[in-house]
């Protein structure tokens, strides 16, 4: 089972690696807020909520990051701020937040699995595919277990964190 898990995880990480350009662009967008006078507001959904404190309060949190909890908080965001929305899937709630951000002309990044039903991800300017749409490890009864959303997000997060750290270092050298 461990070999299958390892092989499947490597496949997910390879799919994420193929999005490196999108991840770099998303990191640059978020860094515009962190390096300027703005903040990075982070809204997580469903099981990804467990990762929110890490992104905003840990020793390796995104710079100038804050948790975003309610839609009415969007009115406090200005043009110097950016928003990061992270969910396992495109839910009605995530789509509602996307609509509100678009209505308010706020720059944002979305990390989630592709929206196979409605193709919402195709209309986004800054989108990173989580690449974990289903469980990956087969069992003896032919079902599958382990849907590694958090592992995939952690991998994407650390790529973004490293990119943003490098940008900070480059800016400090100038």
Task: Please provide the spans of the model-predicted regions.
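Generic N-terminal amphipathic, Lys/Arg-enriched alpha-helix
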Residues: 1-17
């Amino acid at each position: 089972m461990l070999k299958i898990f390892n092989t499947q995880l490597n496949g997910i990480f390879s799919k994420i690696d193929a999005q490196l350009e999108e991840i770099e662009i998303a990191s640059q967008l978020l860094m515009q807020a962190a390096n300027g006078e703005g903040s990075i507001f982070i809204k997580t959904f469903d099981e990804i909520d467990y990762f929110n404190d890490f992104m905003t309060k840990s020793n390796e949190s995104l710079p100038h990051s804050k948790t975003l909890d309610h839609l009415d908080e969007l009115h406090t965001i200005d043009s110097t701020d950016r928003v990061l929305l992270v969910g396992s899937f495109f839910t009605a709630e995530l789509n509602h937040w996307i609509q509100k951000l678009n209505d308010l002309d706020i720059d944002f990044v979305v990390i989630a699995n592709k929206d196979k039903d409605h193709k919402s991800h195709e209309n986004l300017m800054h989108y990173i595919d989580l690449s974990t749409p289903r469980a990956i490890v087969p069992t003896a009864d032919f079902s599958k277990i382990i849907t590694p959303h958090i592992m995939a997000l952690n991998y994407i997060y650390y790529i973004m964190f490293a990119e943003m750290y490098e940008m900070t270092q480059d800016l400090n050298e100038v």
